Amino acid sequence: MLSNLLLTGLPKSGKSTLLENFISLVGDRKRGLLTREVLRNDERIGFDVVTSEPETARLARVDFASSLRVGKYGVDTSLFETVLRPLFNVKEGELLYVDEIGQMQLHSVEFGRLVQRYLDAPQLCIGTVSTVYEHSVISALRERKDTQIIEVKVENRERVFSIVKEVGERYLKGETVLEPITI
């Protein structure tokens, strides 16, 4: 039985925006996190994580002095992990979401545990996953029988959003079985 829906695609394909737009339509019955870019003078200087609690933490910055690096960004897992703790307290009926299961986030072992917790939960979990980075957590989730992965492309973004919205609405009405989706 499918209970997880993961959106994948190249950077800038729209997968995070799609998930964020969907999550904004869901009421209070949700738990998870979104990764947002931080801009200064129209230039990306880092990434923050915003949770459903709501809490915000800096995840990465160009000026972080950290041994954990992703490109030009230093990653601070201690700040990140502080806001993750409450997200483990999953309540029945909540829709779970994670943006993004990617290289910066997976520097945190706690984040890997949270992803596993969400994917193993009986609730619907909708997330985004990197296509440009491999990690044991990403490899394992690609093999899960309870997970459907949909590639988001410019030409199918609107269709994928409609599908995600429909699946989420059905789940929140009490339908717990996710049917295989064809794009």
Name each model-derived stretch.
Residues 7:
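Hydrophobic anchor at the beta1->P-loop junction of P-loop NTPases
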Residues 20-70:
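N-terminal phosphate/diphosphate-binding loop that engages ATP/GTP or pyrophosphate donors
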